[in-house]
Swiss-Prot record:
Gene3D superfamilies: DNA primase, PRIM domain (3.90.920.10). Disulfide bonds: none annotated. GO terms for molecular function: DNA-directed RNA polymerase activity. Pfam families: DNA_primase_S (PF01896). GO terms for biological process: DNA replication, synthesis of primer. This is Uncharacterized DNA primase small subunit-like protein AF_2298. Belongs to the eukaryotic-type primase small subunit family. Coiled coil: none annotated.
Length: 280
């Protein structure tokens, strides 16, 4: 499958993925992002090659699946899994559990957590992707899907979702105080860390997703159906861009052609500690 992206954006090779995670990926920054929750009780996941079709041959049978990492001793352990799989994407589970070991012992599929006594809530998030908006050149999401270009986008579409993200942020901050914006590699995520958002019921989330559907969000993220979200500071291997938290002041001028570019596209990566980033 061929994708259409803005200039300079392309799938990363296996060697480039390995280079990024060995020398540039910052465990310190990930730990800070997840600092509000118990990392030991957090599940992670990798998608090996679902969209890029670039993967280690031994993982062909699972290249399209989300491989859940729920038995780990911390972020260094998670990084070992990442280096094993060299995935196109890395994610974390927004669900908050009292004891994730109980989920593992019971063989939970994580799809029916809402009524479980071990489930404490879910981090609220909004996922605004450029393919969700209509484009005078490339059509609607339905048109793109028919052509097999569901994840493709142009700068016109990107600028539309950038504007929508700003508008959605402005509307959300009237209700919530702890908001963070993240460039996902293609579009944007808005994370809500207010406790009242964490405790929202599934029914409340469904209504909320419907209320904000005009912002080109993926409703299944906001309504709680999809619990995984891309891990900040990881590599979006489909477009070779770093998933990057942004201040709201940075958002209006953010351009994926010039920002969040990994070192392997700029120059030879500089060797650094596994727990430190070589980027400033």
């Amino acid at each position: 499958m061929k994708y259409r992206f803005p200039k300079g954006m392309r799938p990363s090779t296996l060697r480039e993925r390995e280079s990024f995670y060995r020398y540039e990926f910052s465990l310190d920054r990930v730990e800070k992002w997840l600092g509000w929750r118990d990392i030991g009780n957090t599940a992670f996941a990798v998608i090996i090659g679902r969209h890029s079709d670039i993967y280690l041959p031994e993982y062909e049978d699972i290249k399209r699946k989300a491989v859940i990492i729920d038995e780990h001793k911390g972020l260094a352990d998670v990084l070992d899994y990442i280096l094993q799989y060299l995935p196109e994407g890395v994610y974390y589970d927004r669900n908050v559990y009292s004891d994730i070991k109980l989920c593992v012992e019971r063989g939970c599929d994580y799809k029916n957590c809402w009524g479980c006594e071990n489930f404490l809530g879910q981090e609220l998030a909004f996922d605004i992707d450029p393919e969700n908006v209509s484009c005078p050149y490339h059509g609607s999401i339905e048109d793109k899907m028919k052509r097999g270009e569901g994840l493709s986008f142009c700068m016109l579409e990107f600028k539309k979702v950038r504007k929508l993200t700003l508008s959605l942020y402005d509307e959300l901050r009237a209700e919530y105080k702890k908001l963070r914006v993240v460039f996902s590699g293609r579009g944007f995520h808005i994370h809500v860390f207010d406790r009242k958002a964490l405790k929202m019921s599934r029914e409340e989330r469904v209504e909320l997703a419907k209320a904000y559907s005009h912002y080109a969000i993926d409703e299944w993220v906001t309504n709680g159906e999809m619990r995984l979200i891309r891990l900040p500071y990881s590599l979006n291997g489909l477009v070779s861009r770093i998933c990057s938290p942004l201040s709201i002041e940075e958002l209006p001028a953010f351009d994926p052609r010039n920002h969040s570019i990994p070192s392997f596209l700029l120059s030879s990566p500089r060797r650094s500690s596994r727990a430190s980033s070589s980027r400033p």
